A protein has these predicted regions:
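Alpha-helical transmembrane segments of multi-pass inner-membrane proteins
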Residues: 109-136, 150-211
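Flexible juxtamembrane loops connecting transmembrane helices in multi-pass membrane enzymes
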Residues: 233-269, 294
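N-terminal signal-anchor transmembrane segment
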Residues: 1-47, 62-74, 126-132, 354
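A juxtamembrane structural motif centered on a specific transmembrane helix
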Residues: 1-6, 45-49, 173, 338-342, ...
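Transmembrane alpha-helices of multi-pass inner-membrane enzymes
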Residues: 346-357, 363-393
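Long extracytoplasmic/lumenal interhelical loops at the membrane interface
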Residues: 258-317
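Aromatic-anchored transmembrane helix interface
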Residues: 34, 54-68, 75-100, 114-120
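Hydrophobic transmembrane alpha-helices and their immediate junctions
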Residues: 45-51, 176, 217-219, 223, ...
Length: 393
């Protein structure tokens, strides 16, 4: 098995491995997989790296070392050591070998199908288990589905990756049977209570649906029944409970935006306030991996990360680290979307899929969200090329 195929197969394990991450004896499982993937990525990218990316990777090492120097140990979250570098390596790989990456996903149809089936069986069975549901008092005491993960924000990224893989399978094979596998992850979106992931999941479906509709007026007409259907489903699901719990009233603890964002805007304000008090070198290269946790710990009973990619990376790796992150996302979008001259609506939807997650939840710290984003871009590109080819015949 060559390194590209090995990388493809390792990446596809994340949605299944993540399900078991909360098990006491398996807490290490995702971290071990992530380290293996990083080793393979380093092997693949360092061999034939463009000078531009070599300079960027060197800078990433510099900001990482500086962040470690600024960190007061022990770490609140040891995973933070890996996320940022992993994302940059992933970006370098996909932008350097776009055709190679696409070909290996095509060749692994059966493997992808087995991963989707295994995830669907595990999560599907858990739907009927009372232990898969939790009462969250912070979210209005609603009953939320977490499957065997124990956490809605651990389950939701796996749902997103499965939806991406299912749509990717359909785009690459044109076999409609794969679309039935969307049902369980959509149930997960509706019942886990994450408004961000529910919205992102719907945007992913809309992006593929827009390309599918050859006559675009059909797409816009179809939005009417789809909006009505989703409205009914949301109002009668845990998502509706979460929306009701985060609706601002005169009795709300936070202000309007604080209530809507579950207090995130309060953390953001504190994080930025203390970041701008740092010296210019720390602002350029970052304040360390614990900076955001230490700030919230000082003012609240628990330490929290920023829940925002831009602020988190700014605090950890400074202006330079944030600039590299934004450039890496642009590089991916340019390679798979912008250079293909895709319709403006598709470009907008893809941008919002990344931006909403990065802004209101965090994108680069959820492995399944990170891993499935380039896969979604590959599937959209291949499907768009296929539809354009048919239209030109």
């Amino acid at each position: 098995m060559n390194a590209n195929k090995l990388l493809c197969r390792l990446l596809l394990l994340f949605p299944v491995f993540t399900l078991f991450q909360s098990f006491p004896l398996l807490r290490w499982i995702n971290k071990a997989l992530l380290i293996c993937v990083i080793i393979v990525l380093l092997f693949l990218t360092v061999r034939k790296m463009k000078k531009r990316w070599a300079g960027i990777l060197f800078t990433v090492v510099v900001v990482h070392v500086y962040a470690l120097m600024q960190t007061t140990f022990p770490l609140y979250n040891s995973n933070m050591l890996f996320y940022y570098g992993f994302w940059i390596l992933l970006t370098i790989y996909y932008t350097s070998y776009p055709e190679c990456a696409a070909s290996y996903f095509k060749e692994n149809e059966r493997y992808i199908e087995k991963i989707v089936q295994l995830w669907s069986v595990i999560v599907g069975i858990s739907i009927f288990m009372p232990s898969s549901y939790v009462i969250n008092k912070a979210w209005g005491s609603g009953r939320y589905f977490v499957s065997i993960t124990g956490d809605a924000f651990r389950l939701a990224p796996t749902c997103l990756m499965i939806v991406t893989l299912v749509l990717g399978l359909y785009c690459l094979t044109k076999r409609k049977k794969y679309l039935f596998y969307i049902i369980i992850p959509m149930y997960g979106f509706l019942m886990c209570g994450s408004r961000t992931y529910l919205g992102i999941g719907l945007l992913v479906v809309l992006a593929f649906w827009y390309i599918y509709c050859e006559k675009k007026r059909y797409f816009y007409f179809s939005l009417i029944p789809l909006v009505i259907l989703m409205g009914i489903l949301i109002l009668n699901s845990a998502a509706g409970s979460k929306i009701a719990a985060t609706t601002y009233t005169t009795n709300s603890f936070f202000d309007k935006w604080g209530t809507i964002t579950n207090g995130r805007t309060v953390f953001w304000s504190l994080d930025l306030k203390y970041f701008f008090k740092e010296n210019i070198l720390n602002q350029l290269l970052g304040c360390g991996f614990n900076f955001d946790y230490q700030i919230t710990k000082r003012f609240y009973t628990a330490a929290h990360w920023a829940h925002n990619d831009f602020i988190s990376i700014l605090l950890n790796f400074g202006y330079i680290g944030l600039g590299i992150y934004i450039y890496s996302v642009y590089g991916l979008l340019k390679t798979f979307i912008l250079d293909m001259r895709m319709p403006k609506l598709v470009v907008t939807l893809v941008f919002m899929i990344w931006f909403l997650n990065a802004m209101f939840n965090m994108f680069y710290t959820y492995t399944c969200s990170m891993v499935c984003f380039p896969m979604m871009l590959i599937a959209l590109k291949e499907y768009y090329m296929f539809k354009v080819g048919i239209a030109n015949e």
